[in-house]
Amino acid sequence: KTGEVVVAAAPLYTLLDFFMMCATIAGGEETLYQEKIAPDEVAREALERQRELLTLCDPIAFEINPIQVHEILSSNQKKFTYCPFVFGYSNYCRPGYSTYQLKACNVVRYGERMLKTTLGGTGLAISSKCEHLQETVDFCQYAASETIQKTIFFDAGGQPGYRTAWLDPAVNRRSNGFFADTLETMEQASMRPRYNGYMQLQDNGGTVLREYLMTGRDLTGTLERLNTLYRKSRGLQG
């Protein structure tokens, strides 16, 4: 309420935060992504809580993404000091990367539960048109190996995916504890939907949520429009 909190609420991230709130309130994903994204009572509570937070935040939240949140917090500005949940970038917790070194930790709790965040990240993929398949496979295995993940990969500014690297004392010493101090969040996070057609929902769902989150108008209609988009993305009727 002091105005020191900043969050990323550009359209895509409001949708992913909605997934997070639904998974947290529902206590898991078993009831999610059926005929609707979530049962009505879960979805309503999720959006109401998102709006409650955003009404306490600077309107700049609706224009920024997670990297911009990190840029703001690690800069010389004096207004914002904390973000309760955001995709993590370990670079900002390393010395010398930005004006100020950030400190990352596990996400906040909602009631008795830690928020069940939506897992992000990127990976390596091999094209079906690859002309040097074995060499490419060998490189992927090399890059993803335990030793490389906690040494060369991290040294080059990479964010390792190998769990052992997240627990490695040297890696954590050089990243202000980023990996060890956020590991619980990662371990209980939920995967975003992966069905064929999902990107249609991801690309447009946040825009559907945006007006309600900014104005508080027509919660019921907002959820109806979001679920219509969801059903269309899944090829469901109605």
Sequence positions of predicted segments:
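Extracytoplasmic/periplasmic substrate-recognition and gating elements
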Residues: 94-159
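Beta->alpha turn/N-cap motifs
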Residues: 66, 83-91, 122
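Extracytoplasmic/periplasmic solute-binding protein
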Residues: 1-36, 77-80
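Short helices/loops that flank or line small-molecule/ion binding pockets
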Residues: 1, 54, 66-82, 207, ...
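Non-transmembrane alpha-helical segments in soluble domains
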Residues: 47-55, 70, 127, 136-145, ...
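Paired acidic/hydrophobic, glycine-rich loop segments that form the ligand-binding mouth/hinge
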Residues: 79-86, 103
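Glycine-centered hinge/linker elements that transmit conformational signals in sensory
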Residues: 19-22, 33-66, 107
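Long, aromatic- and glycine/proline-rich binding clefts that accommodate carbohydrate-like moieties
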Residues: 154-207, 211
